[in-house]
Swiss-Prot record:
Top-level division of the source organism's lineage: Eukaryota
Subunit structure: Homotetramer.
One of the Pfam families matching this protein, by short name: S-AdoMet_synt_N
Organism for this UniProt entry: Hordeum vulgare
Name of this chain's protein: S-adenosylmethionine synthase 2
Keywords for this protein: ATP-binding, Cobalt, Cytoplasm, Magnesium, Metal-binding, Nucleotide-binding, One-carbon metabolism, Potassium, Transferase
Gene: SAM2
Family the UniProt entry places it in: Belongs to the AdoMet synthase family.
Amino acid sequence: MAAETFLFTSESVNEGHPDKLCDQVSDAVLDACLAQDPDSKVACETCTKTNMVMVFGEITTKATVDYEKIVRDTCRDIGFISDDVGLDADHCKVLVNIEQQSPDIAQGVHGHFTKRPEEVGAGDQGIMFGYATDETPELMPLTHMLATKLGARLTEVRKNGTCAWLRPDGKTQVTIEYLNEGGAMVPVRVHTVLISTQHDETVTNDEIAADLKEHVIKPVIPGKYLDENTIFHLNPSGRFVIGGPHGDAGLTGRKIIIDTYGGWGAHGGGAFSGKDPTKVDRSGAYIARQAAKSIIASGLARRCIVQISYAIGVPEPLSVFVDSYGTGKIPDREILKLVKENFDFRPGMISINLDLKKGGKRFIKTAAYGHFGRDDADFTWEVVKPLKFDKASA
């Protein structure tokens, strides 16, 4: 390995992982509430273990929601249809413990629904980050994109019958050798690919390895990144028959790096799933991603991070920060000025500008395979805003 290159790794889990099951249930509840009442205030957590799923939290909504049906439908859609695969959607225990939003929080944030959008305060304090890089068409880190796409492909070949031995739970991890080009990240080659997937009792380790290479890795990872030295760890622990909630307990909000940038950039610690847009953990991270992506797409920098922070009940962010890692065409302070001029970071306005009060089947799509770098009209924060700057002076 040449001296100037380095290795970096990102991981992902697919929709049958117990933590991701919980994220999807929480966002399915949010979708159901917003579909009937766009002003729903939702903070929905989910946990699961063998033969049990529980939803709990604070929800204030005019919507009529059948929580048990949402849980069972979500688990069934993932593929949890029998105890053999880790959970039986139609026969597991479903527990529900939902209360109304605290009146203290309601008064401080939205004045019990009386405040105009521009007056709505942040639902809590916190810090959020957005990140973007020019190393992929999605303006996302390649390690993260490949790990995520491998997980999505595992699910695809399970559901379409290509690899009938697959079961819902699975994890992926990709290590890439990078070149640091003046602060910009240039992928050189894929160093290691790791896949651990749940499977049925009938398949052999050799069959697993052959199918994963042919039907999962080959369609996802561009050949130019693979060479004779690329390392493959395919189900390295051997058997992985017991999975899903039977294998491990699951909780909402446990996969926040997988949801974002795969360890690149930074993370404020707040999870996304099950939260309505007054929760800046979610809406703040979405607008920060849009700002960071727009900086790169507009040619202002090759890589950048944006941080914003909030106080509970206060509409305006306390701080906005931009760092282009030395790749900026103009000074970071000028990029920051453009960001502040072009983006409204007040939570009520983020909701309007990114259309975050729309439910349906929208947010459940974010709850597996990443919230960013997705080509889908519902991912409104991925729409680039052109940022105009004086190229002559740059």
